[in-house]
Each structure stands twice: as structure tokens, then as C-alpha cells.
UniProtKB/Swiss-Prot annotation:
This is 6,7-dimethyl-8-ribityllumazine synthase. The keyword Transferase applies. The gene is ribH. Pathway: Cofactor biosynthesis; riboflavin biosynthesis; riboflavin from 2-hydroxy-3-oxobutyl phosphate and 5-amino-6-(D-ribitylamino)uracil: step 1/2. Keywords: Riboflavin biosynthesis, Transferase.
């Protein structure tokens, strides 16, 4: 029996990070977590490229451009969509989720969904580096693991 599993070694790998400016305070915290994870796992700073987009809805397009460029071993999407009084949250969170997944499947480059979809700002803050850890850090670790796992096939 052969078992495939991605390693958490990233020497020489290059990652693109896309961050939504909407809810920038949260996005910035997620970005810090992602950069920390990449550096801790051996990614050189010059192999990390960051693109800021207006909001989560714009992420799939830039993710597709990054993934199709073949410059990156993985792309990490970070941001926060926080529920408000209108159905806008449902539309945005659904479409960005589908868009990110579709880019990954189409390009065969790991495109990692690190976009928080929360009911409150407090929940987002908790997931951006306080009580619930930093989901940006987790997304970066996932990107490293998936980039290495894909090399096995």
C-alpha cells in the first residue's frame, strides 16, 4: 500500500497571496499569519508576492491570473466576509468560495481558501489571531502541504 501525504518543507517554493481590502484590519492580521507560516517553513521573503484586491468577490480573478502564470507553487486567498443586515453576505461568500475552488480545479495549482465567513466582527477577530488561532497561518500551511502533495502525482 502506498500513502501520499504532502510534506511541510517549502525551500525554493514561491507563493502568491491575495488579500481583500474590505475588512482590512482582519485581512492584515490573516496576512501576517500567512507570512509567518511561510517563513517558518522555509519560504524566502522574495518568494512571497502579495496582491491586494478591493474585496473577496474580486479574489477568484486574480487567483486565476496568478495560478495560470505558473510562477507560484500555490496561491492563498485571505479576507473576511462578515454578515450584515442584507443577503449580500450570502451572495459574496457563496461566489468567492465557488470561484476559488474552480480556479484550483481548472489550473491544478493549489488555491487555498483563507477567507473568513463569519456572523460577527468578533468571530472574525477571534479567527485572525486571538482565541481561535490565525486562519491565515493555517491557510499558508495548507498551501505548502498541497503544493508538495501535487508533486507526488
Amino acid at each position: 500500500m502506498r500513502v501520499y501525504e504532502g510534506k511541510l518543507i517549502s525551500k525554493g517554493q514561491k507563493f502568491g497571496i491575495i488579500v481583500g481590502r474590505f475588512n482590512e484590519f482582519i485581512g492584515g492580521k490573516l496576512l501576517s499569519g500567512a507570512i509567518d507560516a511561510l517563513k517558518r517553513h522555509g519560504v524566502d521573503e522574495e518568494n512571497i508576492e502579495i496582491a491586494w484586491v478591493p474585496g473577496a468577490f474580486e479574489m477568484p480573478l486574480i487567483a486565476k491570473k496568478m495560478a495560470k502564470s505558473q510562477k507560484y507553487d500555490g496561491v492563498i486567498c485571505l479576507g473576511a466576509v462578515i454578515r450584515g443586515a442584507t443577503p449580500h453576505f450570502d451572495y459574496v461568500s457563496s461566489e468567492v468560495t465557488k470561484g476559488v475552488a474552480s480556479v484550483s480545479l481548472e489550473t491544478e495549482v493549489p488555491v487555498i481558501f483563507g477567507v473568513l465567513t463569519t456572523d460577527t466582527i468578533e468571530q472574525a477577530i477571534e479567527r485572525a489571531g486571538t482565541k481561535a488561532g490565525n486562519k491565515g497561518f493555517e491557510a499558508a500551511v495548507t498551501a505548502i502541504e498541497m503544493a508538495n502533495l501535487l508533486k507526488e502525482f
